[in-house]
Regions:
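Conserved Rossmann-fold NAD(P)-dependent oxidoreductase catalytic core, especially the SDR/UDP-sugar
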Residues: 98-141
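N-terminal Rossmann NAD(P)H-binding glycine-rich loop of SDR-like oxidoreductase domains
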Residues: 4-23
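NAD(P)H-binding glycine-rich loop region in Rossmannoid oxidoreductase-like domains
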Residues: 53-92
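A conserved pocket-lining segment of Rossmann-fold NAD(P)-dependent short-chain dehydrogenase/reductase
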Residues: 82, 170-180, 190-214, 218
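Active-site helix of classical SDR
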Residues: 146
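Conserved beta-loop-beta element that borders a ligand/cofactor-binding pocket
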Residues: 117-118, 151-177
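C-terminal substrate-binding subdomain of Rossmann-fold SDR/epimerase-dehydratase oxidoreductases
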Residues: 204-206, 212-317
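Flexible, glycine-rich beta-alpha linker
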Residues: 122-123, 141-142, 166-186
C-alpha cells in the first residue's frame, strides 16, 4: 500500500490534491503537511501535521516513521511574491527541492516524487503561441529561474541516481476553494470573488493579457494521472507542458457578464503585467497527451459557471 506525503497541503493545489489522493488511496495513507494550518476538510479528513520542508532532519524522521513511498512537494514562494523577496524565494524554492531530492535518493522506500514546474520557465524569447515542449527557456523572474533550475535538477537526479521525479509545467490554476496566493494568474480567481461580492473587479493585468489557464479539477486529475502512469511510457524526465485553455481578462469578464450582466471590470496593470508579458499565450501539450493521455473537462464557459456557483456557496451568498 502506498504511503503518500503531501508537502504544502494548505495551498491552492495541495488542499484539493489531498482530498483526491485520500479518495484513491485511503485517508489513513495520505499524510498532509504544511508550515501553517490547513483547511478543515484536510485536517479532519486524515493525518495532518505541521512540517517545515526546510528542516531536513525532521523531514527524514517523518518519512521513515510513516514509511512514506511517494512525495508530492508543492511548497513554494509563488511568482508575484517571489519578486518582492528574490533571494529568500530562491533559497526556499531551491533548498526545499534539494532536500526532497536527496531524501528520495537516500531512502529506498520512496519510489516516486511529484514536483510542480510552471509556464514561468518560459521567457520573452520563447515563442508565445503554441509554445512547444522543447523550446527556448530564458525566464526573467525569480520564480521562473528557480523552476527552470528545478527542472534541470530533477532530470539530473533521474539520470544520475534513478530518482523517479514527475513534473507538470502548470498554467494558471483556477479554484474557488482557496483564495489567491500571490501568483501572476491569480486575477482569474480574484475576479470571481469580487464579481460575487462587489459586482466589479479591478484587474492587475491588461484586458488583452492572454494566458493559459486550467480549472483545478483538471489539474489535479492530470497530476495524479501522471504519477500513476507507467514509467516506461514517459519520454521525458524534466517537466511536461500542459495547456489548459487560454483566455484574457476581457474574455473572462464577458463570460461572467452572461451570469451577472451588471458586472464591471477596470484595468490597472501593476508589476505582474511585465511577468505576464514574458509568458506564453498558449501551449502545445501534445507530448503529455501522447505519453500519458492528458485530457481536459473544462472550457471557459463551464469553468465560469462552476466558479460562480462555488464562490457563492463558499461566501454563503
Amino acid at each position: 500500500m502506498e504511503k503518500i506525503l503531501v508537502i504544502g497541503a494548505a495551498g491552492q493545489i495541495g488542499s484539493e490534491l489531498v482530498i483526491e489522493l485520500r479518495k484513491r488511496y485511503g485517508a489513513e495513507n495520505v499524510f498532509a503537511t504544511d508550515i501553517k494550518q490547513a483547511p478543515d476538510d484536510v485536517v479532519e479528513g486524515g493525518p495532518f501535521e505541521i512540517l517545515d520542508v526546510m528542516d531536513g532532519n525532521r523531514l527524514i524522521h517523518f518519512v521513515i516513521r510513516h514509511k512514506i513511498t511517494q512525495i508530492y512537494h508543492l511548497a513554494a514562494v509563488l511568482s508575484g511574491n517571489a519578486e518582492k523577496i528574490p533571494l529568500q524565494a530562491w533559497d526556499i524554492n531551491m533548498r526545499s527541492l534539494m532536500n526532497i531530492l536527496d531524501l528520495a535518493k537516500e531512502v529506498d522506500a520512496i519510489k516516486k516524487v511529484f514536483w510542480p514546474s510552471s509556464i514561468a520557465v518560459f521567457g520573452p524569447s520563447t515563442p508565445r503561441f503554441n509554445t512547444p515542449q522543447y523550446t527556448i527557456t530564458e525566464p526573467n523572474t525569480v520564480y521562473g529561474i528557480s523552476k527552470l533550475a528545478g527542472e534541470r535538477w530533477i532530470e539530473y537526479y533521474y539520470n544520475r541516481y534513478g530518482v523517479d521525479v514527475r513534473s507538470i509545467r502548470y498554467p494558471g490554476l483556477i479554484s474557488y476553494k482557496t483564495e489567491a496566493g500571490g501568483g501572476t494568474t491569480d486575477y482569474a480567481v480574484e475576479i470571481f470573488y469580487d464579481a460575487v461580492r462587489k459586482g466589479k473587479y479591478s484587474s492587475f493585468l491588461s484586458k488583452e493579457a492572454k494566458l493559459p489557464m486550467m480549472f483545478m479539477e483538471d489539474a489535479i486529475k492530470a497530476t495524479v494521472d501522471l504519477m500513476e502512469a507507467d514509467e516506461e511510457n514517459l519520454s521525458l524526465h524534466s517537466s511536461y507542458n500542459v495547456a489548459g485553455i487560454s483566455f484574457d481578462p476581457q474574455e473572462l469578464a464577458a463570460e461572467i457578464q452572461k451570469h451577472i450582466p451588471e458586472f464591471e471590470i477596470s484595468y490597472n496593470p501593476d508589476f505582474r503585467q511585465a511577468i505576464a508579458d514574458s509568458w506564453p499565450a498558449s501551449i502545445d501539450d501534445s507530448v503529455a497527451k501522447a505519453d500519458w493521455g492528458l485530457k481536459y473537462k473544462y472550457g471557459i464557459a463551464e469553468l465560469t459557471r462552476v466558479m460562480l456557483e462555488g464562490v457563492r456557496k463558499k461566501l454563503d451568498l
